Amino acid sequence: MNLTLVLNGERRVMEAVRTVAELVAALGLDPRKVAVERNLEIVPRSAYGATELADGDQVEIVHFIGGG
C-alpha cells in the first residue's frame, strides 16, 4: 500500500508503510533518537506501532543529536 505523506515539509510517497514505527524503520532511523509529530500532535514513542498513518498525513521527524 502506497501512502503520500508530507514528511518534514516535503511530499513523499512511501511504500508498505502503515504505522509510525514502520515509517521510522523505512527511513533507517533509530526510534530511540527521534521525536515524531503527526498532524500537529506529538506521537509518544510507546505508540509508534499503534499509530496508523493515512494518505495526506503531515509528519515531522526531529533527530536528537548529542553535543556539548
What is the predicted role of each segment?
Residues 1-67:
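Ubiquitin-like/PB1-type beta-grasp interaction modules and other compact soluble beta-rich domains
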